[in-house]
Amino acid sequence: DIEGNTITTDKATYDKIKDIIITFNNSKLTFENNYELKSNKIFYNNIKKIISSDQNSILTDIDGNIVTVNMFQYYLEKHLFSSIGKIKIVDIDKNKYFFKELHVDTKKREMIGSDVTVLLDQENFGVSKENDPRFVANDIFVSKNKTNLSKGVFTVCQKKEGRCPPWTLQAKKIIHDSIKKTIYYEHATLKVYDMPIFYFPRFLHPDPTVKRQSGFLSPFFTNSSSLG
């Protein structure tokens, strides 16, 4: 189309009255900022300027981050990719994100999601295989240089079915500034076995890249036998 969006597919039909193209099997959509989307079925509504699918689809950005969804709608005029349901992202650092709702601004390259679980890669985070570093949060907003989590909970404790982590760090807001390589917490509470121990109006520490590059140890707890 005139926006530079292209679709390739094995098979397609065109409804002239509704001005809708439907593709089948091995369909690939390429659009602005080198986003690429693959699906077995794509609907292109030229009147409403919406591209959509009710099938499992995979969205990949120019950096190699991979988004897997079970449905999507892409609003051409708003440059907005939206999905509800089972959503998974694997980023280039092998971190895994799970959402129930996701919206991606393909022009600004920003993302917002809800009901978020983030499983951080153990090796990149600098912890042993006995630890499971992770975040859960109500919402997440990701821009070029910052990641914002609202009502977030962080722990590195190993997952144990039916048991709460030995410790968690909970905060009203968690901000990761990739330029300053710092993680900020607002209204943070350290809990041990779900009991509040310390409260910090504000708290910050270097992100794991500082530890890897300089050997500087970030102030976080690891899983230990003393905490179960």
Where are these regions (language model features)?
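Structural signature for solvent-exposed beta-strand/loop edge elements and short helix-capping sites
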Residues: D1-G228
